[in-house]
């Protein structure tokens, strides 16, 4: 039996509307991702890597539109998903680590609570059990003294440490696919 990809994008085209004009941002982009595989999308700055991958979690900007192709996941075309469909996929099955950790974290909420919320929502753990799992995730991503750091706010972390927190939030969901948009 042939191996089937977890996700398969075929000839995806994305257009943006800007000041009454159409801008073709992605033209006939395709990929297949298989279980256990690491796949890198490489290109120049501004080449559309982020625009393309945001479609795997339903986060295309409001002025953007998929104008061609398909993205198949679990036998369904994601280009046809409604917001309700995305609620069952985003985070739980496919998670994404965005480029800028400061725009991914809530500056008014402690780091640990942000990870804990992800665990509670996607793993179904509650209270102390979820808190313990959040502290474990901080340790797994290399945050020293995770018990103390759990109680701190994003501004108390370096840029690299904030990025690791965002990775912890995404990984805590235990997704089938983890998309990392320049997670350095």
Residue ranges and their predicted role:
Residues 77, 129-148:
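Conserved ABC ATPase "signature" region
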Residues 42-44:
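The feature captures the beta-strand-to-loop junction immediately N-terminal to the Walker
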Residues 91, 155, 173:
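Conserved signature/switch motifs of ABC ATPase nucleotide-binding domains
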């Amino acid at each position: 039996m042939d191996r089937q990809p977890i996700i398969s994008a075929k000839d995806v085209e994305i257009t943006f509307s800007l000041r009454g004009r159409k801008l073709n941002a992605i033209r006939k982009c395709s990929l297949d991702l298989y279980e256990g595989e690491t796949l890198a999308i490489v290109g120049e700055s501004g080449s559309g890597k982020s625009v393309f991958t945001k479609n795997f979690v339903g986060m295309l900007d409001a002025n953007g539109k998929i104008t061609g192709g398909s993205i198949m996941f679990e036998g369904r075309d994601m280009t046809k998903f409604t917001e309700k469909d995305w609620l069952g996929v985003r985070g739980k099955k496919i998670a994404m680590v965005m480029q800028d950790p400061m725009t991914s974290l809530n500056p008014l909420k402690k780091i640990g609570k942000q990870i804990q919320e992800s665990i509670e929502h996607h793993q179904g753990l509650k209270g102390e059990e979820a808190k313990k799992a959040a502290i474990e995730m901080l340790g797994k991503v290399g945050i020293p003294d995770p018990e103390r750091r759990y109680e701190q706010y994003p501004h108390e972390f370096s840029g690299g440490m904030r990025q690791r927190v965002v990775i912890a939030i995404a990984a805590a969901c235990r997704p089938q696919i983890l998309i990392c948009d320049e997670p350095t």
